[in-house]
Regions:
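Conserved beta-strand termini and adjacent loop/short-helix elements that scaffold enzyme active sites
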Residues: 35-37, 95-99, 149, 191-193, ...
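A short acidic, glycine-rich active-site loop
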Residues: 56-73
Length: 278
């Protein structure tokens, strides 16, 4: 894996999320491309809201001129991005994307191996819950796998594969494995939470056989009950694990999760979440 994108609102850079991004780049000896979304043409946020966002990111701006405010924040955040990358021994590349944010991100993802984004990234004039509409659209339309960044990063303990026997959940497992061969020594947990429609014994055997060709330490956990609540109970304590989930479609989560299951997971867990779709 050579091209990793870090997507951010140019006005507000989540510096803490860069720790995980730099960890990945160090692991794979990759450069990190910072995608700074300037949203110059259809800015819906008033100056007051932009100033609040900038302040949350550590920048105190005095001007009420939207263009001047954006330019100052973009310049300061690009410098911060470069400083953090240099501190971590990572080569940081900057793209200033000045068009429509969603369109810019999708085009960038077409020519990348992996995209990293914070679940709170938003260009709406209204306060939004997590994940925001912008992030949900990115998950649905991105043309490479996406990782929802953790709030903070203190190291990687285990990989958690969510599995229900469907092709999309297996596709996500395979995509993660192909992108992260350096993690073959990391313990893998295959988690299945089902209230019905269990994977067949033959399917589970084939998955085990495939996983043993790629990983050295594998655990299997099967639980009964309500998928949404049981899944959250199982994932929340895993503070140093990365969670791998299947396809995120615009109308449905076509693996273990439907939209009512996916949203609570992305809202509540603080771990990195890897999402891939066909």
């Amino acid at each position: 894996m050579k091209k990793i994108l870090y997507v951010t609102d140019a006005v507000k850079l989540e510096a803490s999320a860069l720790d995980f991004a730099c960890y990945l780049c160090t692991l794979f000896r990759s450069k990190l491309t910072g995608i700074f979304l300037e949203n110059l043409y259809k800015e819906a946020r008033p100056a007051k809201m932009l100033k609040e966002a900038a302040l949350e990111g550590g920048i105190n701006v005095q001007t009420d001129n939207t263009d001047e405010l954006k330019e100052q924040c973009t310049s300061d955040n690009i410098q911060l991005f470069k400083t953090i990358c240099e501190k971590n021994g990572v080569t940081g590349i900057v793209h200033r994307d000045k068009g429509i944010p969603l369109e810019d991100v999708i085009i960038e993802s077409r020519y990348a191996d992996l995209l990293l984004i914070d679940a709170s990234t938003s260009f709406s004039a209204q306060k939004e819950s997590v994940p925001t509409r912008f992030v949900t659209d990115v998950l649905a339309d991105a043309e490479c796998p996406v990782i929802i960044l953790p709030e903070s990063f203190e190291g990687l303990n285990k990989i958690v594969f969510t599995y229900d026997g469907r092709s999309s959940s297996v596709f996500a497992i395979k995509q993660f494995t192909y992108l992260f061969p350096e993690l073959r020594e990391t313990t893998v947990v295959v988690m299945t939470v089902m209230d019905n429609n269990r994977p067949s014994p033959e399917e589970k055997y084939k998955l085990k056989e495939w996983l043993h060709d790629h990983y050295t330490n594998i655990e299997f956990i099967e639980q009964d009950g309500n998928v949404k609540y049981q899944l959250l109970d199982s994932l929340l304590p895993r503070t140093k694990d990365i969670i791998v989930m299947g396809a995120f479609g615009r109308n449905a989560f076509s693996t273990l999760f439907n939209p009512s299951h996916a949203t609570p997971v992305l809202k509540l867990v603080t771990q990195p979440v890897f999402i891939a779709h066909h």
